[in-house]
Regions:
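S-adenosyl-L-methionine
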Residues: 1-30, 40-47, 69-95
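Class I SAM-dependent methyltransferase "Motif I" SAM/SAH-binding loop
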Residues: 35-38
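Conserved SAM/SAH-binding beta-strand->alpha-helix loop
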Residues: 60
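A short acidic, Gly/Pro-enriched loop at the edge of an enzyme's catalytic core
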Residues: 91-100, 105
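A short glycine-rich, Lys/Arg-flanked "PGG" loop and its adjoining helix->strand segment in the class I
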Residues: 120-134
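Conserved beta-strand signature within the Rossmann-like core of class I S-adenosyl-L-methionine
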Residues: 135-142
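Class I S-adenosyl-L-methionine
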Residues: 153, 158-205
Length: 205
């Protein structure tokens, strides 16, 4: 059945359990979604791609409970849940394990004095680079103008990633395989246009 892990102070033990299950599953590829919210994309992706393993990470109890309930109701067997901050276990993963990492609508922390609370930071990007396969992609979405600039600034600081956009439509139009989440629909209703950024991991220059 579905794999999910409760908070555990022994992080090395918990990540060891996760890694053992990753090996046991023998998936075609592994995709990480950070901050899955209501789980719309996570659930749809897993149902459409049963040979792909999805690891969802979200620190909020309510979202975890709803998502785990849906996983069990639909008998989805290719989702694992880390119900906490991904930064607590990111260093435990082997290098080059994820084919894709999704970060949809992270908290923008718009005030300048709170900028260090934003998930996207130089050090965190280094961690993501290490666990992402070469030519793997990071997909980010945001509806906040400050966060749009911040994402581009942080990624431009790291020569290991290449922004894939060639035209404005590449970041204005949602990738075809993503579903509209409740948060995204609310943003559009309130006239906040979501922007979609895709960065590919390349060898550092």
């Amino acid at each position: 059945g579905a794999k999910y892990f409760i908070k555990n102070s022994h992080l090395s033990l918990t990540s060891k359990l996760i890694l053992e299950d990753l090996v046991e599953f023998k998936p075609k590829k592994i995709i990480l979604e950070i901050g899955f919210g209501s789980g719309e994309n996570l659930l749809k992706s897993a149902k459409m791609n049963p040979d792909v393993l999805y690891l969802g990470a979200d620190p909020f109890l309510n979202t975890n409970a709803k998502c785990i309930k849906a996983i069990l109701n639909y008998n989805i067997k290719n989702i694992m849940i880390w119900p906490d901050d991904i930064r607590k276990i990111i260093e435990f993963f082997p290098s080059n394990i994820f084919s894709e990492i999704k970060i949809l609508f992270p908290d923008p922390w718009p005030k300048f004095k709170h900028k260090n609370r934003r998930l996207i930071q130089d050090n965190f990007l280094i961690s993501l680079y290490n666990v992402l396969k070469t030519n793997g992609i990071i997909t980010l979405a945001t509806d906040h103008f400050i966060m749009k600039s911040w994402i581009l600034e942080i990624f431009q600081n790291n020569s290991g990633f290449q922004w894939t956009a060639e035209t404005a439509d590449d970041w204005r139009i949602k990738p075809i395989h993503y579903v509209a989440t409740k948060y995204e629909q609310k943003a559009i209703y309130e006239n906040r246009d979501p922007h979609w950024f895709i960065f590919k991991k390349i060898k550092k220059i």
